[in-house]
């Protein structure tokens, strides 16, 4: 794959197009039209949805999701002349689920992406990541710059390694109050809460941090006091907003009923290892063409009270093409919003 500036700009445009959907609210994309392949990478096997031919675009989901979160974007980008690969991240869906917390550190997860590129016979890929998929993509671009042509992060901007581990920072910030990542830290607690009724837990979480859940309890994923019954505190909407259909929820539910939540939750628990193993991330930047896309009502934006974490999204990206913040939308941006304008040009800034 050529690495000329013109080519790289074209690839960035394609990564923006990866977010574009002709999705009509209330419609669901059937699973069966997509082609699936199990690919060995970095000591694990990942189940991937694969469509199209051409330059490689890898779409990386977050918590608690699946390849299916990209169901509205896979085919439009493949039809535009790209080879789109959307894996179930390790720990999820039909991919391998190692038991140890250490198997979910950022070294392992970025290694999975590089291994996918190798296994698919490519030199480079465009990366598009959402939620935890965004740090996986940002960090792969920073750690392996020669392998990544462009990167788009959704929901979570690129943050360099801080002076202390993330969970320590959250503990200092929230004290005795509730913050979801601290709740996830103790093995078995969140697993029991979510696995008691997977469908209800997913339904409540998907609603709570969406744009529709702006005023719902725990929309910020934090509270000034401890919260003992997290799932019980969240609202169960009736009806659910049209961006997630009952068949969509069926698909997510079946996957998590079968695979559980330990692997996905282990990603949060492995953050201390990231800090220990990757000190170079305190200075590395993302030099590839890059952009950031999020919903204006995404709770990630206000994780640090009084600070807009999206304001400096490109601070450590040397070829940053701007942020696109979508009014009225929340955390599940590629499912909540059709981003039709992005197919035309790489964004500078839009609201």
Locate predicted features.
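A short loop-to-beta-strand scaffold at the N-terminal edge of the catalytic core in hydrolase folds
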Residues: 42-50
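Conserved HGGG/HGGXW glycine-rich cap/lid loop of the alpha/beta-hydrolase fold
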Residues: 50-96
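Active-site helix-initiating loop/hinge in glycosyltransferases
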Residues: 62, 105, 336-337
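N-terminal secretory signal peptides and thylakoid transit peptides that target proteins
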Residues: 2-17
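Catalytic active-site module of serine/aspartate enzymes centered on a nucleophile-bearing elbow/loop
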Residues: 318-351
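C-terminal segment of N-terminal export signals and the immediately downstream linker at the start
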Residues: 22-42, 351
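Flexible "cap/lid" subdomain of the alpha/beta-hydrolase fold that forms the substrate-access gate
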Residues: 32-34, 46, 92-128, 132-321
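Active-site loop/turn elements of alpha/beta-hydrolase fold enzymes
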Residues: 89, 156, 328
């Amino acid at each position: 794959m050529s690495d000329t500036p013109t080519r790289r700009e074209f690839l960035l445009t394609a990564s923006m197009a990866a977010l574009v959907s002709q999705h009509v609210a209330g419609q669901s994309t059937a699973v069966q039209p997509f082609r699936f392949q199990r690919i060995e990478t970095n000591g694990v096997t990942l189940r991937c949805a694969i469509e199209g031919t051409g330059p490689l675009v890898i779409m990386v989901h977050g918590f608690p999701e699946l390849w299916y979160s990209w169901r509205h974007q896979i085919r439009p980008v493949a039809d535009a002349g790209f080879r789109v690969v959307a894996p179930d991240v390790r720990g999820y869906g039909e991919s391998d689920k190692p038991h140890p917390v250490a198997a979910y550190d950022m070294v392992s997860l970025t290694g999975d992406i590089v291994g996918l590129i190798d296994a698919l016979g490519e030199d480079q890929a465009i990366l598009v990541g959402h939620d935890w998929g965004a740090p996986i993509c940002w960090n792969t671009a920073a750690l392996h710059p020669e392998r990544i042509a462009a990167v788009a992060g959704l929901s979570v901007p690129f943050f360099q390694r801080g002076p202390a581990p993330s969970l320590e920072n959250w503990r200092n910030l929230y004290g005795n109050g509730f913050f979801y990542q601290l709740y996830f830290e103790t093995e078995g607690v969140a697993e029991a809460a979510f696995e008691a009724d997977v469908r209800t837990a997913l339904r409540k979480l998907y609603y709570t941090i969406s744009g529709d859940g702006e005023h719902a309890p725990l929309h910020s994923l934090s509270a000034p006091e401890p919260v003992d019954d997290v799932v019980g505190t969240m609202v169960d909407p009736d009806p659910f907003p049209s961006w997630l259909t009952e068949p969509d929820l069926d698909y997510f539910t079946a996957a998590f009923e079968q695979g559980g939540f330990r692997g996905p939750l282990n990603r949060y628990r492995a953050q201390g290892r990231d800090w220990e193993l990757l000190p170079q991330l305190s200075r590395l930047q993302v030099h590839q063409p890059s952009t950031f896309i999020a919903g204006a009502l995404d709770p990630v934006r206000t994780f640090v009270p009084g600070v807009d974490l999206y304001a400096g999204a490109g601070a450590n990206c040397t070829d940053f093409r701007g942020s696109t913040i979508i009014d009225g939308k929340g955390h599940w941006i590629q499912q909540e919003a059709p981003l039709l304008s992005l197919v035309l040009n790489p964004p500078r800034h839009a609201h």
